[in-house]
């Protein structure tokens, strides 16, 4: 059975190299940012397992680890609050990340105001740049 799609399919290209190791993907809520973030992680994992990916073309070099920071439920926020929980999970990533890692951040720091989130996000991205890892940070923040 063929799938009928009325809307035009939008393709995406990402190239991690010495010129660009960190991407910040912005846009409105429900604009597809999370889909791209998950698709990148899936393509990386599938390729490293020797499995095919859904792409016209894919050249993917191996990573030593894939770290994810996606919104979680409220279970761990009682003691620390949601921002504290997010920062604790970011700290866990920083303790393990290397220049051969892929870090996927999806709507990280959305538990606080845009000024504070932008400040913390800039520090996080600066730290990840220091490690030299590959990173995709999808956010609704525009600052």
Give, region by region, the residue ranges found by the protein language model:
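ATPase nucleotide-binding head domains, primarily ABC-like/P-loop NTPase cores
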Residues: 1-143
């Amino acid at each position: 059975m063929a799938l009928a799609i009325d809307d035009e399919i939008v393709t995406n290209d990402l190239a991690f190299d010495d010129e660009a190791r960190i991407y910040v993907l912005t846009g409105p809520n429900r604009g597809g940012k999370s889909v791209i973030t998950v698709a990148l992680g899936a393509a990386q994992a599938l390729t490293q397992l020797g499995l095919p990916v859904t792409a016209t073309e894919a050249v993917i070099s191996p990573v030593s680890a894939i770290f994810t920071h996606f919104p979680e439920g409220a279970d761990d926020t009682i003691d620390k609050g949601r921002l504290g929980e997010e920062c604790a999970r970011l700290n866990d990533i920083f303790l393990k990340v290397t220049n051969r890692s892929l870090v996927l951040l999806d709507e990280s720091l959305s538990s606080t105001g845009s000024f504070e989130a932008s400040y913390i996000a800039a520090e996080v991205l600066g730290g990840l740049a220091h490690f030299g890892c590959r990173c995709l940070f999808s956010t609704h923040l525009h600052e």
